Amino acid sequence: MSLLTLVHILVSFSACVEAISRADFPPGFIFGTASSAYQYEGAVNEGQRGPTIWDTLTKRPGRVIDFSNADVAVDHYHRYKEDVELMNDIGMDAYRFSISWSRIFPNGTGEPNEEGLSYYNSLIDALLDKGIEPYVTLFHWDLPQALEDRYGGWLNSEIIEDFVQYAFTCFKEFGDRVKHWITFNEPYNFAIDGYDLGIQAPGRCSILSHVFCREGKSSTEPYIVAHNILLAHAGAFRAYEQHFKNEQGGLIGIALNSRWYEPFSNADEDTEAAARAMDFELGWFLDPLMFGHYPPSMQKLAGDRLPQFSTHASKLVSGSLDFVGINHYTTLYARNDRLRIRKLVMDDASTDSAVIPTAYRHGKKIGETAASSWLHIVPWGMFKLMKHVKEKYGNPPVVITENGMDDANHPFSRLEDVLQDDKRIQYHNDYMSNLLDAIRKEGCNVHGYFVWSLLDNWEWNSGYTVRFGLYYIDYKNNLTRIPKASVQWFSQVLAQKTAII
Protein backbone atom coordinates (compact mmCIF):
# COMPACT_ATOMS: atom_id res chain seq x y z
CA MET A 1 0.00 0.00 0.00
CA SER A 2 1.44 3.36 -1.02
CA LEU A 3 1.73 6.26 1.39
CA LEU A 4 -0.62 8.30 -0.81
CA THR A 5 -3.28 5.59 -0.64
CA LEU A 6 -2.94 5.36 3.13
CA VAL A 7 -3.32 9.11 3.50
CA HIS A 8 -6.43 9.01 1.31
CA ILE A 9 -7.94 6.26 3.48
CA LEU A 10 -7.18 8.16 6.69
CA VAL A 11 -8.66 11.38 5.33
CA SER A 12 -11.79 9.54 4.22
CA PHE A 13 -12.09 7.85 7.60
CA SER A 14 -11.65 11.16 9.41
CA ALA A 15 -14.35 12.77 7.31
CA CYS A 16 -16.66 9.85 8.08
CA VAL A 17 -16.06 10.07 11.82
CA GLU A 18 -16.60 13.85 11.86
CA ALA A 19 -19.71 13.72 9.68
CA ILE A 20 -23.03 14.44 11.35
CA SER A 21 -26.41 13.00 10.49
CA ARG A 22 -30.06 13.08 11.42
CA ALA A 23 -29.64 9.73 13.14
CA ASP A 24 -27.21 11.20 15.66
CA PHE A 25 -29.98 13.36 17.13
CA PRO A 26 -32.79 12.18 19.42
CA PRO A 27 -35.87 10.61 17.82
CA GLY A 28 -38.32 13.24 16.65
CA PHE A 29 -35.69 15.99 16.44
CA ILE A 30 -36.88 18.59 13.90
CA PHE A 31 -34.78 20.03 11.09
CA GLY A 32 -36.07 23.00 9.15
CA THR A 33 -35.37 26.33 7.49
CA ALA A 34 -36.47 29.78 8.60
CA SER A 35 -37.60 32.97 6.88
CA SER A 36 -39.57 36.15 7.51
CA ALA A 37 -42.40 37.77 5.60
CA TYR A 38 -40.68 41.06 4.86
CA GLN A 39 -37.42 39.45 3.73
CA TYR A 40 -39.07 36.84 1.51
CA GLU A 41 -42.54 37.68 0.29
CA GLY A 42 -42.25 40.82 -1.81
CA ALA A 43 -45.61 41.77 -3.37
CA VAL A 44 -45.86 44.71 -0.98
CA ASN A 45 -48.69 46.30 -2.96
CA GLU A 46 -50.68 43.12 -3.60
CA GLY A 47 -53.37 41.28 -1.70
CA GLN A 48 -54.59 44.42 0.11
CA ARG A 49 -51.45 44.42 2.26
CA GLY A 50 -50.94 47.60 4.28
CA PRO A 51 -47.59 49.39 4.59
CA THR A 52 -45.21 48.50 7.42
CA ILE A 53 -42.58 50.43 9.36
CA TRP A 54 -39.92 48.73 7.22
CA ASP A 55 -41.52 49.98 4.01
CA THR A 56 -41.21 53.44 5.54
CA LEU A 57 -37.63 53.05 6.76
CA THR A 58 -36.29 51.83 3.41
CA LYS A 59 -37.44 55.08 1.82
CA ARG A 60 -35.04 57.04 4.04
CA PRO A 61 -31.67 57.58 2.32
CA GLY A 62 -28.73 55.77 3.88
CA ARG A 63 -30.69 53.27 5.96
CA VAL A 64 -29.91 50.32 3.67
CA ILE A 65 -26.35 49.93 2.48
CA ASP A 66 -27.21 49.26 -1.18
CA PHE A 67 -30.27 51.57 -1.20
CA SER A 68 -32.52 48.58 -1.91
CA ASN A 69 -35.88 47.55 -0.48
CA ALA A 70 -37.92 44.38 -0.18
CA ASP A 71 -40.70 45.35 -2.58
CA VAL A 72 -39.91 42.18 -4.55
CA ALA A 73 -37.44 40.38 -2.24
CA VAL A 74 -37.37 36.75 -3.45
CA ASP A 75 -41.03 36.82 -4.53
CA HIS A 76 -42.02 34.07 -2.11
CA TYR A 77 -45.57 35.42 -2.27
CA HIS A 78 -45.92 34.12 -5.83
CA ARG A 79 -43.36 31.30 -5.73
CA TYR A 80 -44.07 29.64 -2.39
CA LYS A 81 -45.06 26.36 -4.04
CA GLU A 82 -41.70 26.18 -5.79
CA ASP A 83 -39.93 26.94 -2.51
CA VAL A 84 -41.89 24.28 -0.64
CA GLU A 85 -40.71 21.79 -3.26
CA LEU A 86 -37.11 22.84 -2.56
CA MET A 87 -37.57 22.20 1.16
CA ASN A 88 -39.07 18.82 0.39
CA ASP A 89 -36.20 17.94 -1.93
CA ILE A 90 -33.70 18.57 0.87
CA GLY A 91 -35.71 16.51 3.34
CA MET A 92 -36.62 19.29 5.77
CA ASP A 93 -39.22 18.47 8.43
CA ALA A 94 -40.45 21.99 9.09
CA TYR A 95 -40.59 25.54 7.77
CA ARG A 96 -40.54 28.54 10.05
CA PHE A 97 -42.11 31.59 8.40
CA SER A 98 -43.71 34.76 9.69
CA ILE A 99 -47.14 36.18 9.03
CA SER A 100 -47.24 39.81 7.98
CA TRP A 101 -49.57 41.56 10.43
CA SER A 102 -50.38 44.10 7.69
CA ARG A 103 -51.57 41.34 5.35
CA ILE A 104 -54.09 40.18 7.95
CA PHE A 105 -55.00 43.67 9.21
CA PRO A 106 -53.82 46.29 6.67
CA ASN A 107 -54.62 49.06 9.16
CA GLY A 108 -53.42 47.10 12.18
CA THR A 109 -56.94 46.44 13.49
CA GLY A 110 -60.48 46.02 12.20
CA GLU A 111 -61.83 43.23 10.03
CA PRO A 112 -59.38 40.58 8.79
CA ASN A 113 -58.30 40.83 5.16
CA GLU A 114 -59.59 37.77 3.29
CA GLU A 115 -56.80 37.90 0.71
CA GLY A 116 -54.20 37.76 3.45
CA LEU A 117 -55.93 34.86 5.16
CA SER A 118 -56.20 33.04 1.84
CA TYR A 119 -52.49 33.42 1.10
CA TYR A 120 -51.34 31.98 4.40
CA ASN A 121 -53.93 29.21 4.26
CA SER A 122 -52.54 28.23 0.86
CA LEU A 123 -48.95 28.29 2.13
CA ILE A 124 -49.81 26.19 5.19
CA ASP A 125 -51.71 23.66 3.08
CA ALA A 126 -48.86 23.43 0.56
CA LEU A 127 -46.44 22.64 3.39
CA LEU A 128 -48.67 20.01 4.95
CA ASP A 129 -49.23 18.38 1.55
CA LYS A 130 -45.47 17.68 1.52
CA GLY A 131 -45.34 16.58 5.14
CA ILE A 132 -43.59 19.79 6.23
CA GLU A 133 -44.70 21.20 9.57
CA PRO A 134 -45.38 24.95 9.78
CA TYR A 135 -43.73 26.89 12.61
CA VAL A 136 -45.40 30.28 12.48
CA THR A 137 -43.97 33.55 13.79
CA LEU A 138 -46.53 36.27 14.46
CA PHE A 139 -44.22 39.28 14.59
CA HIS A 140 -40.90 39.54 12.76
CA TRP A 141 -40.37 43.32 13.03
CA ASP A 142 -42.82 44.45 10.30
CA LEU A 143 -45.34 46.43 12.35
CA PRO A 144 -48.22 47.96 10.37
CA GLN A 145 -47.33 51.61 9.78
CA ALA A 146 -50.90 52.51 10.71
CA LEU A 147 -50.27 51.56 14.34
CA GLU A 148 -46.99 53.47 14.42
CA ASP A 149 -48.83 56.54 13.15
CA ARG A 150 -51.91 56.07 15.35
CA TYR A 151 -50.29 55.78 18.76
CA GLY A 152 -46.54 55.25 18.47
CA GLY A 153 -46.52 51.50 17.97
CA TRP A 154 -44.67 49.51 20.61
CA LEU A 155 -44.06 52.58 22.76
CA ASN A 156 -47.75 52.63 23.66
CA SER A 157 -49.35 49.96 25.85
CA GLU A 158 -52.45 50.18 23.64
CA ILE A 159 -50.62 47.88 21.24
CA ILE A 160 -50.83 44.97 23.68
CA GLU A 161 -54.55 44.51 23.12
CA ASP A 162 -54.19 44.96 19.36
CA PHE A 163 -51.46 42.33 19.16
CA VAL A 164 -53.50 39.87 21.22
CA GLN A 165 -56.45 40.40 18.86
CA TYR A 166 -54.20 39.82 15.85
CA ALA A 167 -52.79 36.66 17.45
CA PHE A 168 -56.31 35.48 18.34
CA THR A 169 -57.34 35.85 14.70
CA CYS A 170 -54.35 33.79 13.55
CA PHE A 171 -55.02 31.07 16.13
CA LYS A 172 -58.65 30.93 15.00
CA GLU A 173 -57.92 30.88 11.27
CA PHE A 174 -54.81 28.67 11.12
CA GLY A 175 -54.60 26.84 14.44
CA ASP A 176 -56.37 23.72 13.20
CA ARG A 177 -53.18 23.03 11.20
CA VAL A 178 -50.46 25.09 12.91
CA LYS A 179 -49.20 23.42 16.09
CA HIS A 180 -46.12 25.54 16.79
CA TRP A 181 -46.43 29.29 17.27
CA ILE A 182 -43.69 31.86 17.91
CA THR A 183 -45.04 35.18 19.11
CA PHE A 184 -42.01 37.43 18.54
CA ASN A 185 -38.73 37.16 16.70
CA GLU A 186 -35.66 38.69 18.36
CA PRO A 187 -37.29 41.31 20.58
CA TYR A 188 -33.80 42.26 21.81
CA ASN A 189 -32.68 43.31 18.34
CA PHE A 190 -36.01 44.98 17.64
CA ALA A 191 -35.75 47.08 20.82
CA ILE A 192 -32.05 47.95 20.60
CA ASP A 193 -31.67 48.41 16.85
CA GLY A 194 -35.01 50.15 16.43
CA TYR A 195 -35.15 52.36 19.53
CA ASP A 196 -31.59 52.67 20.88
CA LEU A 197 -29.21 52.68 17.91
CA GLY A 198 -31.93 53.69 15.46
CA ILE A 199 -30.50 51.67 12.61
CA GLN A 200 -33.61 49.56 12.08
CA ALA A 201 -37.32 50.34 11.94
CA PRO A 202 -38.82 52.50 13.25
CA GLY A 203 -35.44 54.25 13.40
CA ARG A 204 -35.68 56.06 16.73
CA CYS A 205 -32.69 57.09 18.88
CA SER A 206 -31.08 59.94 20.75
CA ILE A 207 -27.42 58.89 20.74
CA LEU A 208 -24.91 61.64 20.03
CA SER A 209 -27.60 64.30 20.40
CA HIS A 210 -29.92 63.00 17.66
CA VAL A 211 -27.24 62.98 14.97
CA PHE A 212 -28.67 59.76 13.48
CA CYS A 213 -32.38 60.03 14.30
CA ARG A 214 -34.99 62.74 14.24
CA GLU A 215 -36.62 61.59 17.46
CA GLY A 216 -36.42 59.03 20.24
CA LYS A 217 -34.77 58.48 23.62
CA SER A 218 -32.18 55.72 23.61
CA SER A 219 -31.94 55.44 27.39
CA THR A 220 -35.61 54.64 28.01
CA GLU A 221 -37.52 53.64 24.87
CA PRO A 222 -35.92 50.19 24.40
CA TYR A 223 -37.06 49.22 27.90
CA ILE A 224 -40.60 50.43 27.30
CA VAL A 225 -40.83 48.57 23.99
CA ALA A 226 -39.46 45.34 25.47
CA HIS A 227 -41.89 45.55 28.39
CA ASN A 228 -44.88 45.96 26.08
CA ILE A 229 -43.65 43.06 23.94
CA LEU A 230 -43.43 40.79 26.99
CA LEU A 231 -46.94 41.73 28.07
CA ALA A 232 -48.26 41.22 24.52
CA HIS A 233 -46.57 37.82 24.33
CA ALA A 234 -48.08 36.80 27.65
CA GLY A 235 -51.50 38.05 26.60
CA ALA A 236 -51.38 35.99 23.41
CA PHE A 237 -50.18 32.92 25.31
CA ARG A 238 -53.00 33.20 27.87
CA ALA A 239 -55.58 33.78 25.11
CA TYR A 240 -54.45 30.61 23.36
CA GLU A 241 -54.41 28.73 26.66
CA GLN A 242 -57.97 29.80 27.45
CA HIS A 243 -59.64 29.57 24.04
CA PHE A 244 -57.69 27.18 21.79
CA LYS A 245 -55.28 24.93 23.69
CA ASN A 246 -57.68 22.12 24.53
CA GLU A 247 -59.08 21.85 21.02
CA GLN A 248 -55.98 22.57 18.92
CA GLY A 249 -53.23 21.22 21.18
CA GLY A 250 -50.57 23.61 19.91
CA LEU A 251 -47.46 25.00 21.57
CA ILE A 252 -46.41 28.63 21.93
CA GLY A 253 -42.87 29.96 22.24
CA ILE A 254 -40.78 33.02 21.49
CA ALA A 255 -37.57 33.36 19.43
CA LEU A 256 -34.86 35.13 21.44
CA ASN A 257 -31.55 36.03 19.86
CA SER A 258 -28.51 35.47 22.02
CA ARG A 259 -24.80 35.50 21.57
CA TRP A 260 -22.67 33.61 24.04
CA TYR A 261 -20.43 35.91 26.07
CA GLU A 262 -17.12 34.45 27.17
CA PRO A 263 -15.22 36.23 29.98
CA PHE A 264 -12.31 38.22 28.57
CA SER A 265 -10.07 36.94 31.36
CA ASN A 266 -10.20 34.81 34.50
CA ALA A 267 -10.57 37.93 36.63
CA ASP A 268 -13.76 38.11 38.68
CA GLU A 269 -14.70 41.43 37.10
CA ASP A 270 -14.74 39.90 33.61
CA THR A 271 -16.61 36.79 34.76
CA GLU A 272 -19.23 39.08 36.27
CA ALA A 273 -19.25 41.20 33.10
CA ALA A 274 -19.99 38.12 30.98
CA ALA A 275 -22.87 37.21 33.29
CA ARG A 276 -24.24 40.75 33.00
CA ALA A 277 -23.95 40.62 29.23
CA MET A 278 -26.08 37.48 29.22
CA ASP A 279 -28.58 39.15 31.58
CA PHE A 280 -28.96 42.21 29.36
CA GLU A 281 -29.44 40.15 26.18
CA LEU A 282 -31.08 36.78 26.82
CA GLY A 283 -32.10 37.38 30.43
CA TRP A 284 -33.89 40.63 29.58
CA PHE A 285 -36.67 38.49 28.12
CA LEU A 286 -36.18 34.97 29.43
CA ASP A 287 -35.93 35.93 33.11
CA PRO A 288 -39.43 37.51 33.12
CA LEU A 289 -40.83 34.60 31.12
CA MET A 290 -39.39 32.05 33.54
CA PHE A 291 -39.28 33.92 36.86
CA GLY A 292 -41.68 36.85 36.50
CA HIS A 293 -39.10 39.62 36.92
CA TYR A 294 -36.12 41.22 35.20
CA PRO A 295 -32.57 40.14 36.10
CA PRO A 296 -31.32 41.82 39.31
CA SER A 297 -28.34 43.25 37.42
CA MET A 298 -30.70 45.05 35.04
CA GLN A 299 -32.83 46.37 37.89
CA LYS A 300 -29.71 47.72 39.58
CA LEU A 301 -28.04 49.31 36.56
CA ALA A 302 -31.09 50.58 34.65
CA GLY A 303 -32.89 51.71 37.80
CA ASP A 304 -36.24 53.40 37.39
CA ARG A 305 -35.82 53.51 33.60
CA LEU A 306 -36.65 49.79 33.62
CA PRO A 307 -40.42 49.24 33.95
CA GLN A 308 -41.54 46.93 36.72
CA PHE A 309 -44.15 44.19 36.61
CA SER A 310 -47.15 44.48 38.87
CA THR A 311 -48.01 41.39 40.88
CA HIS A 312 -50.72 40.54 38.35
CA ALA A 313 -48.46 41.14 35.34
CA SER A 314 -45.68 39.06 36.89
CA LYS A 315 -48.04 36.10 37.23
CA LEU A 316 -49.30 36.66 33.69
CA VAL A 317 -45.79 36.67 32.18
CA SER A 318 -44.15 33.99 34.33
CA GLY A 319 -44.39 30.58 32.68
CA SER A 320 -46.02 31.94 29.53
CA LEU A 321 -44.24 29.66 27.06
CA ASP A 322 -44.16 26.03 26.03
CA PHE A 323 -40.71 26.20 24.45
CA VAL A 324 -37.83 28.64 24.10
CA GLY A 325 -36.68 29.55 20.61
CA ILE A 326 -33.03 30.57 20.40
CA ASN A 327 -31.51 32.39 17.42
CA HIS A 328 -27.77 31.90 17.79
CA TYR A 329 -25.07 32.91 15.34
CA THR A 330 -21.98 34.11 17.15
CA THR A 331 -19.94 34.61 20.34
CA LEU A 332 -17.99 37.53 21.82
CA TYR A 333 -15.69 38.19 24.75
CA ALA A 334 -17.07 40.31 27.58
CA ARG A 335 -14.83 42.73 29.45
CA ASN A 336 -15.78 44.84 32.46
CA ASP A 337 -16.21 48.51 31.60
CA ARG A 338 -14.59 49.98 34.68
CA LEU A 339 -14.65 53.62 33.64
CA ARG A 340 -18.11 53.56 32.02
CA ILE A 341 -16.80 55.74 29.19
CA ARG A 342 -19.16 54.08 26.69
CA LYS A 343 -22.10 54.98 28.90
CA LEU A 344 -20.90 58.56 29.18
CA VAL A 345 -20.62 58.91 25.41
CA MET A 346 -23.71 56.98 24.32
CA ASP A 347 -26.14 57.50 27.23
CA ASP A 348 -28.26 54.60 26.02
CA ALA A 349 -29.71 51.27 27.09
CA SER A 350 -27.09 49.14 25.33
CA THR A 351 -24.31 50.50 27.55
CA ASP A 352 -26.18 50.07 30.85
CA SER A 353 -24.62 46.63 31.33
CA ALA A 354 -21.14 48.12 31.93
CA VAL A 355 -19.67 45.57 29.52
CA ILE A 356 -17.22 46.03 26.67
CA PRO A 357 -18.02 43.33 24.09
CA THR A 358 -15.10 42.47 21.83
CA ALA A 359 -14.09 39.87 19.27
CA TYR A 360 -10.39 40.23 20.10
CA ARG A 361 -8.24 39.03 22.99
CA HIS A 362 -4.48 39.53 23.10
CA GLY A 363 -4.57 40.51 19.44
CA LYS A 364 -6.27 37.30 18.35
CA LYS A 365 -9.79 37.16 16.93
CA ILE A 366 -12.29 34.85 18.62
CA GLY A 367 -13.12 33.21 15.31
CA GLU A 368 -13.14 33.65 11.56
CA THR A 369 -15.57 36.28 10.32
CA ALA A 370 -18.35 35.65 7.81
CA ALA A 371 -19.41 38.35 5.33
CA SER A 372 -21.17 40.34 8.05
CA SER A 373 -18.64 41.91 10.40
CA TRP A 374 -20.69 40.94 13.47
CA LEU A 375 -20.78 37.24 12.59
CA HIS A 376 -17.72 35.54 14.08
CA ILE A 377 -17.69 31.78 13.57
CA VAL A 378 -17.38 30.28 17.07
CA PRO A 379 -19.03 26.84 17.16
CA TRP A 380 -18.23 26.16 20.83
CA GLY A 381 -20.44 29.11 21.77
CA MET A 382 -23.47 26.98 20.86
CA PHE A 383 -22.49 24.35 23.43
CA LYS A 384 -21.91 26.90 26.18
CA LEU A 385 -25.12 28.78 25.44
CA MET A 386 -27.21 25.61 25.62
CA LYS A 387 -25.54 24.63 28.89
CA HIS A 388 -26.27 28.11 30.29
CA VAL A 389 -29.97 27.86 29.37
CA LYS A 390 -30.17 24.45 31.01
CA GLU A 391 -28.45 25.47 34.23
CA LYS A 392 -30.07 28.88 34.76
CA TYR A 393 -33.58 28.19 33.53
CA GLY A 394 -34.21 24.58 34.55
CA ASN A 395 -33.64 22.90 31.19
CA PRO A 396 -36.75 24.09 29.32
CA PRO A 397 -37.60 22.71 25.87
CA VAL A 398 -35.45 24.60 23.35
CA VAL A 399 -35.61 24.95 19.58
CA ILE A 400 -32.75 26.57 17.66
CA THR A 401 -35.00 28.81 15.59
CA GLU A 402 -32.14 30.35 13.56
CA ASN A 403 -28.51 29.52 12.83
CA GLY A 404 -26.50 30.31 9.73
CA MET A 405 -23.78 32.36 8.07
CA ASP A 406 -23.47 34.65 5.09
CA ASP A 407 -21.22 35.13 2.10
CA ALA A 408 -20.61 38.48 0.46
CA ASN A 409 -22.56 39.19 -2.70
CA HIS A 410 -19.64 40.23 -4.89
CA PRO A 411 -20.89 41.33 -8.32
CA PHE A 412 -17.88 39.87 -10.14
CA SER A 413 -17.69 36.49 -8.38
CA ARG A 414 -17.87 33.41 -10.58
CA LEU A 415 -21.10 31.49 -10.07
CA GLU A 416 -19.29 28.16 -9.67
CA ASP A 417 -17.24 29.62 -6.81
CA VAL A 418 -20.29 31.00 -5.05
CA LEU A 419 -22.14 27.70 -5.33
CA GLN A 420 -19.27 25.79 -3.74
CA ASP A 421 -20.08 27.07 -0.24
CA ASP A 422 -17.73 24.85 1.77
CA LYS A 423 -17.47 27.46 4.51
CA ARG A 424 -21.22 27.27 5.11
CA ILE A 425 -21.11 23.48 5.20
CA GLN A 426 -18.33 23.59 7.78
CA TYR A 427 -20.22 26.20 9.79
CA HIS A 428 -23.39 24.12 10.06
CA ASN A 429 -21.49 20.90 10.67
CA ASP A 430 -19.51 22.44 13.53
CA TYR A 431 -22.43 24.27 15.15
CA MET A 432 -24.66 21.20 14.89
CA SER A 433 -21.88 19.05 16.36
CA ASN A 434 -21.63 21.35 19.36
CA LEU A 435 -25.40 21.32 19.70
CA LEU A 436 -25.31 17.54 19.64
CA ASP A 437 -22.63 17.52 22.36
CA ALA A 438 -24.85 19.73 24.50
CA ILE A 439 -27.70 17.25 24.09
CA ARG A 440 -25.62 14.13 24.69
CA LYS A 441 -23.10 15.27 27.30
CA GLU A 442 -25.12 17.85 29.21
CA GLY A 443 -28.63 16.54 28.68
CA CYS A 444 -29.82 19.81 27.16
CA ASN A 445 -33.47 19.62 26.18
CA VAL A 446 -33.17 20.70 22.53
CA HIS A 447 -35.85 19.63 20.06
CA GLY A 448 -35.03 21.26 16.73
CA TYR A 449 -32.66 23.20 14.49
CA PHE A 450 -33.68 25.73 11.83
CA VAL A 451 -31.24 26.97 9.20
CA TRP A 452 -31.19 30.62 8.25
CA SER A 453 -31.98 30.41 5.45
CA LEU A 454 -33.38 28.34 2.59
CA LEU A 455 -32.80 31.16 0.09
CA ASP A 456 -30.56 34.16 -0.25
CA ASN A 457 -32.80 37.08 0.65
CA TRP A 458 -33.08 40.75 1.55
CA GLU A 459 -31.09 41.18 4.76
CA TRP A 460 -32.40 44.32 6.46
CA ASN A 461 -29.75 47.08 6.56
CA SER A 462 -27.43 44.94 4.43
CA GLY A 463 -29.99 44.74 1.64
CA TYR A 464 -28.85 42.29 -1.04
CA THR A 465 -25.12 42.63 -0.27
CA VAL A 466 -24.90 39.34 1.66
CA ARG A 467 -26.18 35.82 1.02
CA PHE A 468 -27.34 33.47 3.80
CA GLY A 469 -29.13 30.93 1.63
CA LEU A 470 -28.65 27.27 0.86
CA TYR A 471 -30.02 28.25 -2.55
CA TYR A 472 -28.43 31.01 -4.60
CA ILE A 473 -30.88 33.61 -5.88
CA ASP A 474 -30.05 35.04 -9.29
CA TYR A 475 -31.36 38.56 -8.76
CA LYS A 476 -30.61 39.52 -12.36
CA ASN A 477 -32.38 36.59 -14.00
CA ASN A 478 -35.92 35.99 -12.82
CA LEU A 479 -34.88 35.23 -9.21
CA THR A 480 -33.90 31.72 -10.27
CA ARG A 481 -33.16 29.39 -7.35
CA ILE A 482 -29.86 27.55 -7.85
CA PRO A 483 -28.66 24.97 -5.29
CA LYS A 484 -25.34 25.54 -3.56
CA ALA A 485 -23.18 22.65 -2.38
CA SER A 486 -24.77 22.99 1.07
CA VAL A 487 -28.07 21.75 -0.38
CA GLN A 488 -26.52 18.41 -1.28
CA TRP A 489 -24.74 18.27 2.08
CA PHE A 490 -27.93 18.88 4.05
CA SER A 491 -29.78 16.36 1.89
CA GLN A 492 -27.22 13.74 2.84
CA VAL A 493 -27.30 14.71 6.52
CA LEU A 494 -31.07 14.41 6.65
CA ALA A 495 -31.22 11.23 4.57
CA GLN A 496 -28.79 9.39 6.88
CA LYS A 497 -30.87 7.05 9.02
CA THR A 498 -28.06 5.25 10.83
CA ALA A 499 -25.66 6.97 13.20
CA ILE A 500 -22.03 7.13 12.11
CA ILE A 501 -19.78 5.69 14.83
Curated annotation (Swiss-Prot):
Superkingdom classification of source: Eukaryota
Catalysed conversion reaction: Hydrolysis of terminal, non-reducing beta-D-glucosyl residues with release of beta-D-glucose
Gene3D superfamilies in UniProt: Glycosidases
Signal peptide: 1-19
SUPFAM superfamilies per record: (Trans)glycosidases (SSF51445)
Active-site residues, Swiss-Prot/TrEMBL: 186, 402
The UniProt record lists the keyword Repeat: no
Glycosylated sites: 107, 478
Annotated a beta-D-glucoside binding sites: 39, 140, 185-186, 329, 402, 452, 459-460, 468
Keywords: Disulfide bond, Glycoprotein, Glycosidase, Hydrolase, Signal
Family per record: Belongs to the glycosyl hydrolase 1 family.
Name of this chain's protein: Beta-glucosidase 25
Source organism per UniProt: Oryza sativa subsp. japonica (Rice)
Higher taxonomy: Eukaryota, Viridiplantae, Streptophyta, Embryophyta, Tracheophyta
Annotated gene: BGLU25
